[in-house]
């Protein structure tokens, strides 16, 4: 079998890091428009090890203001890929998000009931359902990551996450891929505040308290299942 992977969204932050860690093809949006089944079908003539689906409209505000477009990409795009991958007996690895949870309780496990707090989270959850329904061989990875720069002078001390920087999360995802894990998995690093995360790359970051009652302050994922499955593997 070919050891090469097919990656959608390869030009994004996560895709850029995965390209450095895996042998893969990363067609452009023009070459591989996931909303056009006829256009993407040609790429599946090759024998890939798996399809890694990253492409999405991930800007929450843009998604909320362009609901039809984000549904087309984030939901119907998943449907198109899952159906074709299933026809080819190809495993699909879908990168989902912690935004499928409301962010109120925290420590969300794979068995907790999703309840998205916004339209972006809804479309990503609907994408998960498309993968589950249309594909026989799948892995859904719920995770969250940050670019390698904290873009603000302050960071919240009372908002908690299991996210980490993209270079860290990309390596965790590659471990998951290479272990050929099936089904649903939450990937991240231990719970920390935004301030603690920001301090990892900027020691001069200032503290701030989030006083917005509607802001999701506990979106961290339970990663116990992942810790058991990953073992001591490193990239």
What residue ranges belong to the model's regions?
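Adenosine-cofactor binding site in Rossmann-like domains, unifying the SAM/SAH pocket
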Residues: 23-43
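Conserved Rossmann-fold NAD(P)-dependent oxidoreductase catalytic core, especially the SDR/UDP-sugar
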Residues: 80-115
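Alpha-helical substrate-binding/gating segment
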Residues: 137, 143-150, 160-188
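Active-site Tyr-X1-5-Lys
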Residues: 87, 115-144
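NAD(P)H-binding glycine-rich loop region in Rossmannoid oxidoreductase-like domains
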Residues: 37-73, 84-86
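N-terminal Rossmann NAD(P)H-binding glycine-rich loop of SDR-like oxidoreductase domains
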Residues: 2-22
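Mid/C-terminal beta-alpha module of Rossmann-like enzyme folds, strongest
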Residues: 172, 179-218, 222
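Glycine-rich NAD(P)-binding loop of the Rossmann-fold in SDR/ketoreductase-type enzymes
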Residues: 35, 65, 69-80, 114, ...
